[in-house]
Amino acid sequence: MKPEIQSSLEYYSDLIEHMDDSHIYSLIFQANSIREKYKGKKIELCAIVNAKSGLCSEDCAFCAQSSRYKTNSPVYSLLEKDEIVKKALEAKKYGVKRFSIVISGKKPSKKELEKIGNSIEAIKKIGIYPCASLGLLEYDEICYLRDKGLERLHCNIETSERFFSNICTTHKFSDKVKTLENANKTGLSICSGGVFGIGESWDDRKEMAEFLKNLNVDSIPINFLTPIKGTPLESKKPLNPMEALRIIILFRLILPDKDIRVCGGRPLLGEFASWIFIAGANALMTGNYLTTTGRHYSDDIKFIEAHGLEVDSVVS
């Protein structure tokens, strides 16, 4: 890494961590200016379908879908293509640009991968970008999905490499990185971010931003922990709104030209929810999340337009 890049990472991270809330406005101004420079007034929307839920073999401490924890998460096998496409059509109707098939588990079986490929092919035909979040995939599996029309592969690194073992022991940070590198080799766009408020430090956040910058990801999902009863993190105190905004600012300043996408946990922002845009976010996940309820598409569109911004719904 170039010395000047390392220097800016440390400078911004230290500044954001230690700055008093009353002095955060200068950073917000800077983050907003960078967002407008690279992204203009466009806000990109994505939506997901929880296409296979529950009974996951992995032990991610924040996740309700792990078979190791007793939660109220729904359990069902892979949805049929028609049901997935129906949900994609609903999202497209409201100007959502990207639609992702998300499944529980370490990775899909060969039969599941084939069915997902057929669903991707159908989604592509309706004029919305097909994305997928399918766990840990090999190069040839990603090539198959790309050839079916997949545009972007998602695989969250979740946190920094040094903190990762505190939240997951059934697979390694390097396993996720391998999946993302495989996707890069195929020419696919890649999406990777994580969950915040899981016990990580500001150094972990800085390291994570640095790693994603080096990996040259296109989209960074920012999720704020929603503690779920039955998981190891059920007693974690949610982040306060100002700290959540600082995280968005950090990622915008370190990854100025990338999509900073606010996803799960938005309700914790409360009356500061509208500040996500001036803090640097240029993308949102809309609709429901995997195991928690989100906002309806129409509500998010009104939310965006109320701030003088517009939905980026153009699919080239």
Curated annotation (Swiss-Prot):
| Broad EC category | transferase
The metabolic or biological pathway listed in the UniProt record of this protein is: Cofactor biosynthesis; biotin biosynthesis; biotin from 7,8-diaminononanoate: step 2/2
Q: Which domain of life is it from?
A: Bacteria
Q: Which cofactor does it need?
A: [4Fe-4S] cluster; [2Fe-2S] cluster
Question: Any note on cofactor binding?
Answer: Binds 1 [4Fe-4S] cluster. The cluster is coordinated with 3 cysteines and an exchangeable S-adenosyl-L-methionine. Binds 1 [2Fe-2S] cluster. The cluster is coordinated with 3 cysteines and 1 arginine.
Annotated Pfam families: BATS (PF06968), Radical_SAM (PF04055)
Q: Which GO terms describe its molecular function?
A: 2 iron, 2 sulfur cluster binding; 4 iron, 4 sulfur cluster binding; biotin synthase activity; iron ion binding
EC number(s) recorded for this UniProt protein: 2.8.1.6
Q: Tell me the residue numbers annotated for binding [2Fe-2S] cluster.
A: S100, C131, C191, R261
**Subunit structure and binding partners:** Homodimer.
Give the protein's function: Catalyzes the conversion of dethiobiotin (DTB) to biotin by the insertion of a sulfur atom into dethiobiotin via a radical-based mechanism.
What protein is this chain from? Answer: Biotin synthase
